[in-house]
UniProtKB/Swiss-Prot annotation:
CTP binds at G8, R11, R91, R137, R140. This is Multifunctional CCA protein. Keywords: ATP-binding, Hydrolase, Magnesium, Metal-binding, Multifunctional enzyme, Nickel, Nucleotide-binding, Nucleotidyltransferase, RNA repair, RNA-binding, Transferase, tRNA processing. A single active site specifically recognizes both ATP and CTP and is responsible for their addition. Comprises two domains: an N-terminal domain containing the nucleotidyltransferase activity and a C-terminal HD domain associated with both phosphodiesterase and phosphatase activities. GO terms for molecular function: ATP binding; CCA tRNA nucleotidyltransferase activity; cyclic-nucleotide phosphodiesterase activity; magnesium ion binding; phosphatase activity; tRNA binding.
Length: 408
């Protein structure tokens, strides 16, 4: 029995990045031998075991053979005679196919270290094409390692394009696609995930609502980048700079889906695009079982981002109605999320990346003033029943109006 550290831990140590998880591969062992040493088996499809003390994962070396469509259509051989190189051969990228023994010796049969140094994401073998999930994984790695200068090898992109055209992506479950989407949103450059999917043709298959934005023009006066799809990825890039909150990043990604529904005769204008996008957002979220928190914020941002952009022109009563509709009184954190998404939208335009966004502080001032209105004072003044709500709203409008007057 021989044990090797494999995959991400070896890769990240070579990149001098923090190591999150350590995965081990065991060569020359049987499940019975592992169990006899106190390991606990957890893998159903192939033998994976938890170490009795560290709870880290130890997988028997294995080979895989394609038997059906989709990422799960494989038969697995985890016999004791499977070699280290055979196991590494089945892995997706060369940078993930490096092993290290307990003496620190590295085994790199597919030149992963050279590709790490060259900042290349390259597939290990043509078996890459057998697993459609790898399209999403490579796009995610491209986003994760974008700041380090990584690019996708041309021959790997060609295979990703072939997979996208094959119909295999449709075999992926919604849960698997969403897991990769959410992981990509966590990266420093989530926009790269979607630009890679666009380049290889996977965006049109998996996220047609986003793909439909490319080629849709916007008014050049406000959007020098013109293209709605380009704008969307610029907004996501800005959202990642402004916030680590994946809900904010997701809302920023889908805030303009309605622009794809604008009548051709009205282009490049997009009247009511925020409201037109609401059914598209609901459908996308239902399809991928997106968490309710993400969905609700995305709907709010799509519905209200134009109002926030025009905040200084809104009447005081309109601002209070916005606060009521969004239930900011009970969910004040949602206001912060909305404003961050709107700021990302404003900055996600060519030449506007460093522009201030005074609307955010203005709306925050309005909300603070309105929040300071005391319900107790209204009740103590003798108001009862429905009058309390009416007077509360009236007092909040007056408080916001005072903020407006002070700014004029």
């Amino acid at each position: 029995m021989k044990i090797y550290l494999v995959g991400g831990a070896v890769r990240d140590s070579l990149l001098e990045l923090p190591i999150k998880d350590r995965d081990y591969m065991v060569v020359g062992a049987t499940p019975e031998q592992m169990l006899a040493q106190g390991y606990k088996q957890v893998g159903k499809d192939f033998p994976v075991f938890l170490h009795p003390k560290t709870q880290q994962e130890y997988a028997l070396a294995r080979t895989e053979r394609k038997t059906a469509a989709g990422y799960g259509g494989f038969s697995v051989d985890a016999a004791p005679n499977v070699t280290l190189e055979q196991d590494l051969l089945r892995r997706d990228l060369t940078i993930n196919a490096i092993a290290q023994d307990d003496q620190g010796n590295r085994y790199d049969p597919f030149n992963g270290i050279a590709d790490l140094n060259a900042r290349l994401l390259r597939h290990v073998s043509d078996a890459f094409i057998e697993d459609p999930l790898r399209v999403l994984r490579v796009a995610r790695f491209a986003a994760r390692f974008h700041s380090l200068g990584f690019n996708i090898a041309a021959e790997t992109m060609a295979l990703m394009t072939k997979i996208s055209q094959s119909g295999e992506l449709e075999a992926l479950t919604a849960e698997r696609v969403y897991i990769e989407l959410d992981k990509s949103l966590t990266s420093d450059a989530p926009q790269v995930f979607f630009s890679v999917l666009k380049e290889c043709g996977a965006l049109a298959v998996l996220f047609p609502e986003i793909d439909a934005l490319f080629g849709i023009p916007q008014p050049e006066q406000w959007h020098p980048e013109i293209d709605s799809g380009v704008h969307t990825l610029m907004v996501l890039e800005q959202a990642a700079k402004l916030s680590n909150d994946n809900a904010v990043r997701f809302a920023s990604l889908v805030h303009d889906l309605g622009k794809a529904l604008s009548p051709k005769a009205s282009l490049p204008k997009h009247h009511g695009h925020g409201q037109k996008g609401l059914p598209l957002i609901k459908a996308l979220c239902e399809r991928f079982r997106v968490p309710n928190e993400y969905r609700d914020l995305a709907l709010l941002v799509s519905d209200q981002h134009q109002n926030i952009h025009n905040a200084h022109e809104l009447r005081a009563d309109t601002i209070v109605k916005l606060f009521d509709k969004a239930d900011f009184w009970r969910k004040p954190h949602r206001l912060e999320q909305l404003l961050l998404s709107c700021e990302a939208d404003a900055k996600g335009r060519t030449g506007f990346e460093l522009s201030p966004y005074p609307q955010a502080s203005y709306i925050q001032q309005c909300f603070k003033a309105a929040s300071n209105v005391s319900v107790k004072d209204i009740i103590d003044a003798g108001y009862k029943g429905a009058e309390i709500r009416q007077q509360l709203t009236s007092s909040r409008v007056e408080a916001v109006q005072e903020i407006k007057l002070n700014l004029e």
